[in-house]
Amino acid sequence: MARRRRPERREILPDPRFGDVVLSKFMNSVMLDGKKSVAESIVYGALEAVEARAKKEPLGVFHEALANIRPNIEVRSRRVGGATYQVPVEVRPDRAQALAIRWLITAARNRSETTMAARLSGELLDASNNRGNAVKKREDTHRMAEANRAFSHYRW
């Protein structure tokens, strides 16, 4: 573990087409093996498909989908006297965004459409309408936290 100060966070540049930092982070998460141009074509293709299918502004649908997936509370394991408790804790905004992005991409990759752009557009549309596997993951997380509410006094 580093003994010095924490390194400052790198500033992520906004994406070239929409000028949005969150979309840029999303693209970086979609990227595999450092192939940014492939990730860009997938994400932009998905956003174009969203625009064609939903007749809505694609960036708005993207942000709405992320807002619907973003968790407010999660459970973390805490060991107390030989027993491990699942303690519900609030999620920091930056972690909530990271989890939402991760869950959205995982849900899209598990879909059955042919191309990744089609899978991503389908999951974005589902998530913006409060459906789909990514939203289900958020609901499951909230349900877990609610079920373990009795252990909330073990917060740290």
UniProtKB/Swiss-Prot annotation:
Q: Which Pfam families match?
A: Ribosomal_S7 (PF00177)
Q: Signal peptide location in the record?
A: none
Keyword set includes Amino-acid biosynthesis? no
Give the CDD domains listed for this entry.
Answer: uS7_Bacteria
What keywords are assigned to this protein?
Ribonucleoprotein, Ribosomal protein, RNA-binding, rRNA-binding, tRNA-binding
Give the record's GO CC terms: small ribosomal subunit
Concerning its family, UniProt says:
Belongs to the universal ribosomal protein uS7 family.
Assembly and partners are described as: Part of the 30S ribosomal subunit. Contacts proteins S9 and S11.
Any idea what this protein is called?
Small ribosomal subunit protein uS7
Which taxonomic lineage does the organism of this UniProt entry have?
Bacteria, Pseudomonadati, Pseudomonadota, Alphaproteobacteria, Sphingomonadales
